[in-house]
């Protein structure tokens, strides 16, 4: 067993050996056979020595004192530790080598003696295989058994007993009668339930243990309870708090940000060639932004997000016509089938199963059946119609998919409502702050009040609110849609009320008005019928395309021997805006980038910046002049703009990437 036990032994022993039969006769009191048949029966023993029958009586309310407070009885004939048979029990050195102990047991054999004494002993007992063969092991076990229920405080993981100092404890027990059974066998049944089994380290008989029983006449002493960690110091780490941390974070999701009007998990198809579907945490806020994150944790930390501006986007559902956005509180009944199925592939097999969004319901009837290839990393998703897409004004597309029809329709309804709300209040925050300035409002009003700007440049509709920057004209909202279809290389459309208007753009619009532009773009329109406010869209579109795209009504070039590029250089040097606009309308990109002769190497942009004319500089850039060009001296247009101290020209050149040599 190998355990070191400190105990007190105070038995009243009465041993009587039968000289004739070689056994001990029982006394008048009830007897009990202890250790008659145990595993130590096969150990080497002297022939004359036989197992002893003992009668142990312990007085009631017996308080034991420490061994140093007691004196040895005078009637003690000899020291029990000097007995060769007890030498292995009462060792002075409890850590004596086991081999030496076994050798001593084999050599020291003595005959039985007759004695009847009382001992008051306290010693360190080293229980091992050699100790198990000693004659006084029975008394030792009995004494230790009486001591254990009162002194055990805790039990280690390896089931090792630890008895505190005996001086600090006292005990009182009733009279215990250990009797011997008449049939010859015996066990310590009265105390077996109080003795915890200790694993033995012996290799000879590893299965030896005290047999447990349930019928115990003496009450079982309660073991000391382990202190719980409920009252531990707050300085240490609390694992329960750490486990509950994610739950506490759920209460503060999105703290410090706008509360989403709808949020949840959706599948999103990647834009790569693999076209895999991955789970995303999607939020829809009242600011007109649809944001998706890789996970809920990223949303809580507000990292790795991507936003979609719904103000310039639309939503589409496969197989359905776009419907008007309704209130978010109005229930929408989903159709059983939208008539369109599409084979798509998905990402991880388990990614289809996820928690639904907060404001959507889940129908178990509409859940797709589990795929037989769910354990694979990728599999094809067949005929899934719970998807929708968002298309931006630039043509970019985002594909999303919900778990059910109801959830998809709830997302579509919420997004459509937000798109409508964004369009109704589509003034940008920057334009709002600028329009609050009285000076800018007066500048825009002055542009509208200029000659010819009170009517649309193409259909004569009153009070136009839209403009074409490179043409320098104002137009109605219907004609502005047609101008958008021409492309930005022909017409750059902006709103007077919704877009930003920096100083250089306001100067361009103030320099070119509708009458000046029509004198150039409609210079040869004699005999043509110009559309009016009541004309159809087809008639307006036909006129606009003929006027700006085909240039059928463009005024002719002046008769001169100079090339168009040289004429443009001269018009720029003379700051002749009308002639420059006419030349730019007729010219090509090569002619616009023509340089001055005589080894100067200056382009029209160099000349415009030397003059500090931001209107001509801006028009030249819009018509394709090279902002990176250098003259014969290696100077860029920005160098001449700095020499002219024209901050407007400097801002325009830096905006379009002209190299800044001063940096």
UniProtKB/Swiss-Prot annotation:
PROSITE patterns: ANK_REP_REGION, ANK_REPEAT, ARFGAP, PH_DOMAIN
Protein name stated in the entry: Arf-GAP with GTPase, ANK repeat and PH domain-containing protein 6
Regions of compositional bias (Low complexity) in chain numbering: 188-202
Superkingdom to which the source organism belongs: Eukaryota
Start and stop residues of the ANK repeats: 600-629, 633-662
Family: Belongs to the centaurin gamma-like family.
Annotated Basic and acidic residues bias: 235-250
Note: Encoded by one of the numerous copies of centaurin gamma-like genes clustered in the q11 region of chromosome 10.
Annotated spans, Disordered: 185-216, 231-255, 359-381
Zinc finger region(s), C4-type: 456-479
Coiled coil feature spans: none
Job of this protein: Putative GTPase-activating protein.
UniProt KW keywords: ANK repeat, GTPase activation, Metal-binding, Repeat, Zinc, Zinc-finger
Gene3D superfamilies reported in the protein's UniProt record: Ankyrin repeat-containing domain, Arf GTPase activating protein, Pleckstrin-homology domain (PH domain)/Phosphotyrosine-binding domain (PTB)
SUPFAM superfamilies referenced in this protein's UniProt entry, alphabetically: Ankyrin repeat, ArfGap/RecO-like zinc finger, PH domain-like
PH domain location: 259-420
MF terms in GO: GTPase activator activity; GTPase activity; zinc ion binding
């Amino acid at each position: 067993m190998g355990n070191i036990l400190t105990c007190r032994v105070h038995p009243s022993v009465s041993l009587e050996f039968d000289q004739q039969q070689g056994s001990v006769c029982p006394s008048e009191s009830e007897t009990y056979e202890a250790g008659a048949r145990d595993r130590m029966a096969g150990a080497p023993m002297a022939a004359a020595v036989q197992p002893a029958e003992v009668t142990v009586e312990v007085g009631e309310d017996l308080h034991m004192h420490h061994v140093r407070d007691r004196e040895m009885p005078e009637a003690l004939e000899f020291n029990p530790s000097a007995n060769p048979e007890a030498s292995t029990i009462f060792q002075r050195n409890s850590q004596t080598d086991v081999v030496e102990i076994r050798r001593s047991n084999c050599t020291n054999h003595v005959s039985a003696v007759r004695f009847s004494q009382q001992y008051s002993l306290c010693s360190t007992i080293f229980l091992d295989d050699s100790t198990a063969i000693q004659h006084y092991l029975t008394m030792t076990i009995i004494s230790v058994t009486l001591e254990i229920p009162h002194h055990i405080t805790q039990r280690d993981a390896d089931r090792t007993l630890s008895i505190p100092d005996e001086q600090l404890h006292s005990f009182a027990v009733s009279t215990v009668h250990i009797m011997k059974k008449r049939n010859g066998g015996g066990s310590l049944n009265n105390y077996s339930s109080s003795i915890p089994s200790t694993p033995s380290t012996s290799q000879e008989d590893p299965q030896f243990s005290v047999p447990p029983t349930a019928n115990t006449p003496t009450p079982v002493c309660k073991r000391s309870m382990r202190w719980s960690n409920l009252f531990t110091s707050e300085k240490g780490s609390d694992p329960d708090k750490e486990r509950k941390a994610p739950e506490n974070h759920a209460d503060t999701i999105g703290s410090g940000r706008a509360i989403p009007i709808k949020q949840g998990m959706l599948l999103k198809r990647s834009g790569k060639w693999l076209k895999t579907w991955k789970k995303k945490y999607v939020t829809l806020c009242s600011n007109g932004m649809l944001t998706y994150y890789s996970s809920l944790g990223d949303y809580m930390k507000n990292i790795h997000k991507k936003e979609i501006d719904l103000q310039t986007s639309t939503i589409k559902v496969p197989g359905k016509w776009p419907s008007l956005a309704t209130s978010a509180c109005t229930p929408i009944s989903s159709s059983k089938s939208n008539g369109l199925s599409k084979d798509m592939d998905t990402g991880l097999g388990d990614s289809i199963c996820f928690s639904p969004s907060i404001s959507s319901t889940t129908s178990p009837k509409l859940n797709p059946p589990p795929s037989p290839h769910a354990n694979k990393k990728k599999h094809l998703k067949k005929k899934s119609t719970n998807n929708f897409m968002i298309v931006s004004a630039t043509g970019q597309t985002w594909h999303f998919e919900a778990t059910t029809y109801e959830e998809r329709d709830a997302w579509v309804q919420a997004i459509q409502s937000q798109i409508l709300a964004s369009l109704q209040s589509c003034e940008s925050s920057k334009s709002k702050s600028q329009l609050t300035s009285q000076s800018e409002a007066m500048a825009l009003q002055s542009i509208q009040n200029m000659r010819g700007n009170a009517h649309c440049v193409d259909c004569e509709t009153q009070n136009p609110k839209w403009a074409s920057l490179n043409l320098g004209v104002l137009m109605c909202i219907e004609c502005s849609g047609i101008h958008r279809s021409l492309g930005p290389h022909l017409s750059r459309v902006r709103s007077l009320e919704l877009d930003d208007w920096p100083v250089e753009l306001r100067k361009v619009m103030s320099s070119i008005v509708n009458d000046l532009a029509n004198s150039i773009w409609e210079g040869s329109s004699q005999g043509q019928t110009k559309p009016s406010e009541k004309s159809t869209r087809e008639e307006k579109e036909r006129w606009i395309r003929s006027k700006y795209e085909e240039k059928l009504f463009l005024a002719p070039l002046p008769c001169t021997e100079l090339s168009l590029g040289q004429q443009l250089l001269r018009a720029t040097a003379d700051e002749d805006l009308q002639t420059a606009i006419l030349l730019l309308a007729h010219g090509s990109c090569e002619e616009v980038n023509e340089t001055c002769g005589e080894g100067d190497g200056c382009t029209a942009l160099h000349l415009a910046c030397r003059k500090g004319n931001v209107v001509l500089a801006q028009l030249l850039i819009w018509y394709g002049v090279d902002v990176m060009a250098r003259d014969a001296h290696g100077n860029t247009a920005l160098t001449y703009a700095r020499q002219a101290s024209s901050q407007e020209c400097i801002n325009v050149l830096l905006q379009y990437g002209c190299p800044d040599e001063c940096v």
